[in-house]
């Protein structure tokens, strides 16, 4: 399960998902080409997180897409998710690797080469590098641009996904000039028409991969 | 480590712990007779919870007192705590037991005999039964009285600690009439003079144990 297709990595955010449950939204995204799903929940109880994760796991299992849980190693273990993604406010990458063992996927966030190298050294399987662009929903995030993402990609030997304000209008440029292995998106996928967002983004990513000769 | 002395089980609450850090407060409580420590944190990041838990674990390890983490199985694994306590909003007892295996302590909350039997069946090592009394800090908690706690104690074959509004003024009555194995307290220990609270409560509990012939 460690060999992952990072082309289009969707991160859930219930604030964008209206009128349907998260599992339904995830299913639309997967049907239209999302290759990895990260379930991200804040400000809910462990029991609620667990129950949502169980439902989402049913969908990802059905389509054989890896499910990554944001932050909560216990929820990942509880639903037998494929992995965990941790950022600066979460458990350190090395601690997560120790708990999960060698077979689960561990991802780390980085906005600098130094952080990315640290996460790689601690056992991360991939890096979420960003923020590429400024995001209205996350004004506190450090913006490193396509250039900052490219430096991270060049520094590490593990896959890198670009994150932060990437959508169908800029995914082509990000892939082409940063050299990353895929795009990670929240609003870019779940804000609005999930089917159209996913298809358009995937087309732009593939167009850039082709241009790069990947 | 499964053989626990549940006599006086302290649950941390930072809102009562002023002018010192949680590890210091826990050390005072342990020095004065607390036999189990539960670290309970809400509304902080996983990283902060982890860092506090590491500090508290240093103290509990020094005095050879078991450390139980409230809710977060991942934090317990990260700091190698002795166990986890889960309530109705947390992961189910059976899931926690499956993740932690047979050697860690798993505690469950119950306000009814039915819930207590369910937790026991799912693999709980002990029950936190209550609320014994109404608590201003937790107005939503179901109050079951000393009688409700006694029914739970009589129904299960695992240790029971009484929780909810128990302090030095009522611990004697609770122990004497409910037959429980110990008292669990938050405010009863950490609100005010921790040393005096702990000593007084322990004296009352022991007086009732003696009266009961335990
Ligand atoms: Ni260009």
Swiss-Prot record, chains A, B:
HAMAP family: TMP_synthase. Its EC number is 2.5.1.3. PANTHER family: THIAMINE BIOSYNTHETIC BIFUNCTIONAL ENZYME, THIAMINE-PHOSPHATE PYROPHOSPHORYLASE. One of its GO terms (biological process) is thiamine diphosphate biosynthetic process. This is Thiamine-phosphate synthase. It catalyses: 2-[(2R,5Z)-2-carboxy-4-methylthiazol-5(2H)-ylidene]ethyl phosphate + 4-amino-2-methyl-5-(diphosphooxymethyl)pyrimidine + 2 H(+) = thiamine phosphate + CO2 + diphosphate; 2-(2-carboxy-4-methylthiazol-5-yl)ethyl phosphate + 4-amino-2-methyl-5-(diphosphooxymethyl)pyrimidine + 2 H(+) = thiamine phosphate + CO2 + diphosphate; 4-methyl-5-(2-phosphooxyethyl)-thiazole + 4-amino-2-methyl-5-(diphosphooxymethyl)pyrimidine + H(+) = thiamine phosphate + diphosphate. 4-amino-2-methyl-5-(diphosphooxymethyl)pyrimidine binds at residues 38-42, 70, 109, 138. It comes from Caldanaerobacter subterraneus subsp. tengcongensis (strain DSM 15242 / JCM 11007 / NBRC 100824 / MB4) (Thermoanaerobacter tengcongensis). The gene is thiE.
């Amino acid at each position: 399960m460690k060999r992952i297709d990072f082309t289009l990595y969707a991160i859930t955010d219930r604030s964008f998902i209206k009128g349907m449950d998260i599992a339904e939204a995830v299913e639309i995204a997967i049907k239209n080409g999302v290759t990895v799903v990260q379930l991200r929940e804040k400000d809910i109880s462990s029991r609620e997180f667990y129950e949502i994760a169980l439902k989402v796991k049913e969908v990802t299992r059905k389509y054989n897409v890896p499910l990554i849980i944001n932050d909560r190693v216990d929820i990942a273990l509880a639903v037998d998710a494929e992995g965990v993604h941790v950022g600066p406010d979460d458990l350190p990458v090395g601690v997560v690797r120790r708990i999960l063992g060698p077979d689960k996927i561990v991802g780390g966030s980085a906005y600098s080469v130094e952080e990315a190298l640290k996460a790689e050294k601690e056992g991360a399987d991939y890096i979420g590098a960003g923020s590429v662009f400024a995001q209205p929903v996350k004004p506190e995030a450090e913006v490193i641009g396509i250039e900052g993402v490219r430096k991270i990609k060049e520094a590490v030997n593990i896959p890198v996904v670009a994150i932060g304000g990437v959508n169908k209008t800029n995914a082509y440029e990000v892939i082409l000039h940063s050299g990353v292995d895929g795009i990670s998106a929240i609003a870019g996928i779940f804000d609005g028409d999930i089917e159209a967002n996913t298809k358009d983004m995937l087309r732009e990513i593939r167009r850039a991969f082709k241009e790069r000769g990947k």
